[in-house]
Amino acid sequence: MADPEKIIKVSVVTPDGIVYSHNATMVAMRAIDGDRAIMYDHLPIVTPLAIGEVRVKRTHEMNDRIDHIAVNGGYIEFSNNEATIIADSAERARNIDVKRAQSAKKRAEQHMQEAKEKHNEREMLEAEIALRRAVNRLHVRENYGK
């Protein structure tokens, strides 16, 4: 069990409200410049996040538990042992609707094909981002959503 004196507070917030809020010993995520992990007494930081998975290692009764959250970009701010992730959208693994994510993936693939045929770079980029978001949600749900 973690030292109760070395705990950080982790919150994930979207425009719809708080998606996640727990005490933890570590939070790990993919920033746009690479993977990061933050623990107790880390220096203050603000950094943009890539589309990816956030892992929160928290204490749960007598053993550690890792929560997984699919995040579609945003940023993390850490200071005074509080980590706040602000994202356009985020979902805990257990809450991801697989059918919705699969539909989003299929739509993104169709949009990519249409953009390719029209030689529209902007639409192609938008479709690629939508595809990465859908694939991220599916990955997090399929691997950690039990």
Swiss-Prot record:
InterPro entries registered for this protein in UniProt: ATP_F1_dsu/esu_C_sf, ATP_synth_F1_dsu/esu, ATP_synth_F1_dsu/esu_N, ATP_synth_F1_esu_C, ATPsynth_dsu/esu_N
Q: Does the keyword rRNA processing apply?
A: no
- What is said about its interaction partners and assembly? F-type ATPases have 2 components, CF(1) - the catalytic core - and CF(0) - the membrane proton channel. CF(1) has five subunits: alpha(3), beta(3), gamma(1), delta(1), epsilon(1). CF(0) has three main subunits: a, b and c.
Q: What does this protein do?
A: Produces ATP from ADP in the presence of a proton gradient across the membrane.
GO CC annotation, single:
plasma membrane
Please give the start and end residues of each transmembrane region.
Answer: none
Q: To which protein family does this belong?
A: Belongs to the ATPase epsilon chain family.
Q: What is this protein called?
A: ATP synthase epsilon chain
Whichever gene encodes this chain, its name is atpC
Q: Where in the cell is it found?
A: Cell membrane
Mind telling me which Pfam families this protein's record contains?
ATP-synt_DE (PF00401), ATP-synt_DE_N (PF02823)
Alphabetically list the UniProt keywords: ATP synthesis, Cell membrane, CF(1), Hydrogen ion transport, Ion transport, Membrane, Transport
Chain positions covered by the region annotation Disordered: 103-122
GO molecular function term, any single one: ATP binding
